[in-house]
Amino acid sequence: MKIYEGKLIAEGKKFGIVVSRFNEFITNKLLEGALDALKRHGALNEDIEIAWVPGAFEIPLIAKKMAESKRYDAVIALGAVIRGETPHFDYVANEVSKGIAKISLDTEVPVIFGVLTTDTIEQAIVRAGTKGGNKGFEAAVTAIEMANLMEEIK
């Protein structure tokens, strides 16, 4: 029996990160977490490229451009969508998650969903580096594992 499992080795891999500027005080923490994870696992600064977009809704377009370029072993999407008083949250959260999943399937480049979708600002703060860990760190670890797994299954 052959078992495939991605390793947590970022050395020699290239990573693209798309970060939403909206809710930047949260997304900066997610980015810090992602960079920490990548570097802890062996990625070099020159192997990481970051693209800032205005909001979460714009993440899929730039993530798609990055994935289609084939310059990256994985792309990490980071953002924070926080529920307000209108249905806007539902539209943005749904479209971003669907868009990111579609890009991975269409390009066969792992595009990792590191977009927080929370009911409150407090929930976002917790998930961006306090008690709930850092979802940016977790997204980067997933990217490393998936990049290695994709290489192994070729």
Swiss-Prot record:
Stated family: Belongs to the DMRL synthase family.
UniProt cross-references to Pfam families, sorted A to Z: DMRL_synthase
GO MF entries: 6,7-dimethyl-8-ribityllumazine synthase activity
Protein's name in the database: 6,7-dimethyl-8-ribityllumazine synthase
Transmembrane segments: none
Catalytic reaction equation(s): (2S)-2-hydroxy-3-oxobutyl phosphate + 5-amino-6-(D-ribitylamino)uracil = 6,7-dimethyl-8-(1-D-ribityl)lumazine + phosphate + 2 H2O + H(+)
Native source organism of the sequence: Thermoanaerobacter pseudethanolicus (strain ATCC 33223 / 39E) (Clostridium thermohydrosulfuricum)
Family matches, as NCBIfam families: lumazine-synth, PRK00061.1-4
GO biological process: riboflavin biosynthetic process
Keywords, sorted A to Z: Riboflavin biosynthesis, Transferase
Gene expressing this chain: ribH
UniProt: (2S)-2-hydroxy-3-oxobutyl phosphate binding residues: 85-86, 127
Domain of life: Bacteria
